Amino acid sequence: MTTAASHTARYPGDAFLEATVARMIRSKSVHGAILCVESGDGSLSWRGAAGNLRADQRYFIASVTKMIVTVVILRLRDEGRLDLDAPMQRYLGTELIRGSHVLGGVDRSDQVTVRHLISNTSGITDYFFGKGPDGTNAGDALLQGNDEAWPLERVVDRVRTLKPRFLPGQPGKVHYSDTNYELLGRIIEVITGSDVADVFDQLVFRPLGLRETYAYRDPDDTSPAPMYYRGRPLHVPKYIASVTAEGGVVSTAAEMMTFLEAFFDGTFFPPATIDELKRWNRIYFPGQFDYGIGIERQWLPWLMSPFQPLGELLGFWGQSGAFAFHNPQRDLFFTGTVNQLSGFGHGAAVSAMVRVMKATS
């Protein structure tokens, strides 16, 4: 399914974009794909799908949710209700966080700041993929279909058994950790006195008129497209309903596009704030993937396009294969999903975005 495009000769046409989304399902791991592309000047607006997904279908955006957390945290900061450089202990108290960062026999959980959490520089281990003393992790159990709720208290209990990656705020260090965002979710609730799902709705979804976007809270809700893990659908509704702040939002490509453009156009905060977020630390080396303050950067090396530099993609990936990125060099915006939890589908999404960027000049 596609929506009609109205664009100038500068942008690729419908046939090219139809072929692009069709290429996304060539990978044997990708059973369905959705791609939405828009230009900042509004002259390109296209949406299509291939495989077992529809262009207007709801899907789990997974960690793209973290950009919503970024908006809320910065809003609270700008209102003077939150200090990024305050220790998380100020908002969460001592009891909850005690033992969450013990390195060399010293508990430094009281040294972890809100800025450390949102920039993934806290050193606190990711509860989802961090391996415990028995060599197992929570992620493996979930990917095998063991659907269980993971409230914050359980997350912190798990983290207490895991070794931190580095000292809080250690220069040049970054570790992607869902634990950080679960803690941020609770901080939002403490400051606002409301459930984080309600805060998302009040500060982000309703102001943007997003009617298909919501925090997934009802395990009986089957309206989002089921996620795939390799060749099979994976149903973990209890888990998703329990992890709102780290990745529990449902949306559509069109509504994620509305959010993505608002994130970068000054709707939520002054454009200068985007520069504040660009304090990059390399997550994957020697790869080209960096984490800033609440956003990610996928740098596209010159080898991908030696004669036509592509620049960078700013936004976020979701473990589910969801994506939301802005290419500032061409002022293009991309949202959608490959709906594959294994990680093997992300390359298909990158290839699609690169293909569109190369065709835009």
Task: Locate the predicted segments by residue.
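Catalytic loop of the DD-peptidase/beta-lactamase superfamily, centered on the K-T-G motif
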Residues: 1-49, 56-60, 90, 171-173, ...
